[in-house]
């Protein structure tokens, strides 16, 4: 897997101060995507253990709330294995930090294992999933942590337990 960017400080892609990893490679090709250069799977540089260590080091700071995964498409089958390895390392070392993931895929398809062999395992490591493609006709700049009204902010663990999406509480002060 390649990555487009690692931001050791990010306040736009989830609650609190976060570390964000932008992976390369996406096939959704959403019109007016904010990161179209990351559609190319070869864009950026290889994501190796050195980059994972950089992310882990950034997460050591006590004021960092968690990790956000964006793209590109973190849940694309070509990216799943590397993303899963990273989130497992984060979970092991920082169980108190939350992990958010932005994807153009739907929760239901990821949970059913319809999006690559690691989609369910990856989902099980996440706290929050922002799902659905960006749709320009549904763009709404007033939404928290997403760009269009079709996208959902989903609490992953209760959703997996119930077998249906449980939405994140947007009134949260985080």
Please place each PLM-identified region on the residue numbering.
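N-terminal pre-triad scaffold of radical SAM enzymes
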Residues: 2-29
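Receiver (REC) domain switch/active-site residues of two-component response regulators
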Residues: 127
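Glycine-rich nucleotide phosphate-binding loop and flanking beta-alpha elements
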Residues: 75, 136-137
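Conserved C-terminal portion of the radical SAM core fold
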Residues: 60-69, 91-98, 130-136, 160-174
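Conserved Radical SAM active-site core
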Residues: 1-4, 17, 35-101, 105-119
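P-loop/Walker A phosphate-binding loop and immediately adjacent motor/lid segment at beta-alpha junctions
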Residues: 82-91, 139-174
